[in-house]
């Protein structure tokens, strides 16, 4: 299994987004270093996902979009949950968004806050980050963030 961090296209763009792919152990090391630098914040348990049956959704199409009932309301509620920062005002990327591959939306503001913490770090760039992570976060902070799959 690999975690995929995928840049969200800006303004509904159709250009294939850039992505980063990590195996679980490597991602765990990256998250540990990001936590040490203050780039990641623990916001407590992740929010609960909306129950599709409550919205009258009866099925999903081949692309995974809900069908029936108030499908649009369900999608809107799901989008709010996937973007939710958590129970804190501390800037940074919420830990729960990086630990699971459920389609979390790491927002541009969360990415920008993480990059600001990185830029304030007085030491050398951590080797665990490699050469692509920080440029990816900068691009996500300037755009619409990224999704974790």
Residue ranges with predicted function:
Residues 1-149:
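Acidic (Asp/Glu-rich) sequence patches and key acidic residues
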């Amino acid at each position: 299994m690999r975690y995929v961090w995928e840049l969200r296209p800006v303004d509904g763009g159709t250009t294939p987004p850039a992505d980063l792919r990590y195996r679980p152990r490597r991602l765990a090391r990256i998250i540990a270093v990001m936590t040490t630098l203050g780039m990641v914040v623990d916001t407590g348990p992740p929010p609960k996902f909306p129950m599709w049956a409550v919205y009258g959704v009866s099925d999903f199409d081949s692309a995974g979009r809900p069908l029936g009932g108030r499908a649009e309301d369900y999608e809107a509620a799901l989008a709010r949950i996937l973007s939710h920062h958590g129970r804190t005002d501390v800037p940074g990327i919420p830990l729960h968004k990086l630990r699971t591959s459920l389609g979390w939306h790491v927002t541009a503001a969360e990415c920008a806050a993480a990059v600001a913490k990185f830029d304030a770090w007085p030491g050398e760039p951590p080797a665990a980050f490699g050469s692509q992570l920080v440029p990816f976060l900068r691009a996500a902070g300037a755009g619409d963030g990224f999704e974790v799959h």
